[in-house]
UniProtKB/Swiss-Prot annotation:
Acetyltransferase; part of the gene cluster that mediates the biosynthesis of an ophiobolin family sesterterpenoid. Belongs to the bfoA family. It comes from Aspergillus terreus (strain NIH 2624 / FGSC A1156). The lineage of its organism: Eukaryota, Fungi, Dikarya, Ascomycota, Pezizomycotina. GO terms for molecular function: acyltransferase activity. Its EC number is 2.3.1.-. One of its GO terms (biological process) is terpenoid biosynthetic process. This is Ophiobolin family sesterterpenoid biosynthesis cluster acetyltransferase ATEG_03569.
Amino acid sequence: MYFFRALLSPVVMWPALVSGKSNSNTANYTVEELWDLEVTFWDNFLYPANVKQVEAINSTLFTTEVQGRVDITRVFNGSELNTEYIFGLFSDPNHLSLVGVPIAYSITQFIAERNIASATTVVTFNATSFGNLLLPVTIDTWIMWDADGRIMQYDATFRWFGFLLDTLVEALATSINGTASQATAALTQLLATTVCDTHDKYCTGENQQYDNSTACYDFLTTAIPLGKDYELGRDTLLCREVHEHMVQYDPKMHCPHIGPTGGDYCVNDQTYEQKVLQKYFNVSWIVGVPWTGNIWLGD
């Protein structure tokens, strides 16, 4: 990176202007400082450090209006919502979960400039619901920090997630001495039962989504599919499994997500093209060049 900086030193470094929005944040960190910020995030992502972040309700690692996108799910706005999903989703080893809790990580790729870092991190999860199976999960991230060292934007991709789901099904098949189809059916039953138990406990009164446990179970096992690897943000059981973890923190917000309507998260409201071309981020990820064609920037 320093070699390229030397080559470009005589050149004017233009901000990336797109629809009047640029990466004009005053933060201008060194590579070492960005590395430290990256490490700080992942240190807090691990269990049990993530529990403390969840208990804070609004993690100080995020700005108040943080924007986040995860490829297999959806976009998440604001510090409270991101605290619940980024830290709360993987913070209870005793609760049924697909991947369990993160216990270690290794950053395998890293490059940084100004207030942005792009990295690949292999996170080891203890899949406590699958016999404490240790799973390496590869997560690609782009993270942008403000001048106070808080995350203002992130874009995350779970690499090889379909392969991961198949591995979990195979592990379950081995444990029940059955076929992959039998394991998938067993997983469907386990997830549906857990979602319905959570609904019965937290989604009461105005937050109730199903008439009773039987109606809940029947809907989750017959009316919607389990879901594919890219459908954790669509009308599937896997999507409701993700949001089930969050219900305890804010039933009013999250109960609809596990209900029949799916709220505004577990719904089939996007085509493939709309997903890819969604205008979302407030600040351009492009720095150092006067590029005006970033189609991901919001209006």
